[in-house]
Amino acid sequence: AIDSSKAIAIIMKNPEFADVRSLEGASPTKHKAMPIIAVSTTSGTAAEVTINYVITDEEKNRKFVCADPHDIPVVAIIDPDMTASMPPKLCAATGMDALVHAI
């Protein structure tokens, strides 16, 4: 959900990128995104504190990465207790994702 909200927030201030696929890669946007308060419920990509986010293109059955320095949330709420209720497999998968990003 954080990734989707980052795309929406950037498009709201940069309507020329209304087709989210145009944001793939290093985004050439000119204006800062709408302010985002990100509440992370898993570990993983760190979209709540970085310029990166991943979007699913259901038409083409693929995912793509966007990177935009104008699209960093203004506040990130990270509560480790949120991960306590995750199923063990999801906890392991998102934890490994966070580890790989850190490396």
What positions do the PLM features span?
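Short glycine/serine/threonine-rich phosphate/pyrophosphate-binding segments
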Residues: 1-6, 46-49
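A glycine/threonine-rich phosphate-anchoring loop and its flanking beta-alpha core
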Residues: 12-103
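DPxDG-like acidic metal-binding loop motif
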Residues: 3-15
